[in-house]
Design a protein with these regions (language model features):
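Peripheral, non-transmembrane regulatory/ligand-interaction domains of membrane transport proteins
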Residues: 1-220, 226-228, 237, 241-251, ...
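Hydrophobic alpha-helical transmembrane segments and their immediately adjacent juxtamembrane loops
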Residues: 69, 240-335
């Protein structure tokens, strides 16, 4: 079939458009399909059609459902929540998952992604931009047409897990920078960063762990028994990759605990250094006070005849000593 040439086709080619459709064949060729031509886009053998919906209108969704006769049970699944789930009906199945990404350094956000697939056609749906889906819109991959809908969904979900691996890499870099700071002179400022990284790792685990139900169900032999061993192999590999991602998230939480132990040890070492200095100062001043007390300081020094001026001068000197000691302590990170 030919791609549409009207205004809708122009919208379909944009990487930021709400509607995007591409038809792949086994020869490694692909073509963009407009929304108006979607009804005529009925994939045959060794072809695969993919529709990507980014924050579409209800009219766009209804048009896709009507053109491809997608199961009605999957329609309310699109905006039905954020909890990862999977379902199927006859020739189609659908899955909801959460992509890691976005937010700021204090909080990582997730984007809900829904895939509806079957009969050599795949629909992906999200309300926000997802980087790897935007890349897939412009890429011209090889013989994607030979893949079934199940294998294409496995590819999408594998990229979804890649977003968690990327987030874990960023977390590990933050841990390394923090530990370098702790071993340097920034230990006093590390506690807030430790708290942030702990919350960040816990949030990432809460986002990833519920996917166990999805990947566990998809890896069972009875999930898509009519699609052959290839789909089973892809889903099993996907479940193994999920378990690896979950282990790495758990390890990220342990890394925060290890950094906290390093922080505690460094704090204890600095406290010991400060106590050694304070002990030395106490011994010296105590010895001086003992000598002064023994002599009674009964000398006819002019200071004792200076009256109020001498008194206030001594007070000013004591205040200056206190401020100097405070400045020294802050500079040495004693408190």
């Amino acid at each position: 079939m030919e791609a549409g040439n009207d205004g809708a086709a122009e919208d379909a080619t944009g990487t930021g458009a709400a509607f995007f459709c591409r038809l792949f064949d086994a020869r490694g060729q692909s073509q963009v399909v407009s929304r108006c031509a979607l009804g005529a886009c009925q994939p045959a053998r060794d072809t695969l059609a993919w529709v990507d919906l980014c924050d579409p209108s209800d009219a766009d969704i209804d048009a896709v459902w009507a053109a491809w006769q997608l199961p009605p049970a999957a329609r309310p699944f699109l905006d039905g929540g954020t909890v990862p789930e999977v379902g199927q009906s006859e020739a189609f199945f659908w899955v909801r998952a959460v992509v890691a990404g976005g937010g700021d350094k204090d909080r990582i956000n997730g984007v809900v992604l829904v895939c509806v697939a079957g009969a050599d056609r795949v629909v992906t749906f999200r309300r926000e931009q997802v980087a790897f889906l935007q890349d897939m819109r412009v890429q011209q991959p090889g013989r994607v047409g030979v893949l079934g809908a199940e294998s294409f969904v496995a590819t999408v979900l594998d990229r979804l897990l890649g977003s968690y691996f990327k987030a874990i890499d960023e977390h590990e870099l933050a841990i390394e920078r923090l530990e370098v700071s702790i071993l340097g002179k920034g230990a006093c400022d590390a506690l807030k960063e430790l708290q942030r990284l702990r919350r960040w790792a816990s949030r990432l685990r809460r986002m990833l762990a519920p996917h166990r139900v999805v990947f566990g169900a998809m890896s069972r032999p009875d999930f898509r028994p009519d699609e052959g061993r290839e789909a089973d192999r892809h889903f099993t590999a996907l479940d193994m990759r999920f378990e690896r991602a979950l282990d790495m998230v758990e390890n990220a939480r342990d890394q925060v605990l290890g950094s906290f132990e390093l922080f505690s040890n460094q704090t204890a070492l600095r406290t010991n250094e400060a106590m050694r200095v304070l002990t030395f100062v106490t011994v010296v001043t105590g010895l001086m006070a003992t000598i002064v007390g023994a002599l009674g300081m009964n000398f006819g020094a002019g200071l004792f005849d200076s009256g109020d001026a001498g008194f206030y001068g001594v007070i000013a000197g004591l205040l200056a000593m206190a401020l100097g000691a405070f400045a020294l302590g802050r500079h040495q990170h004693w408190f």
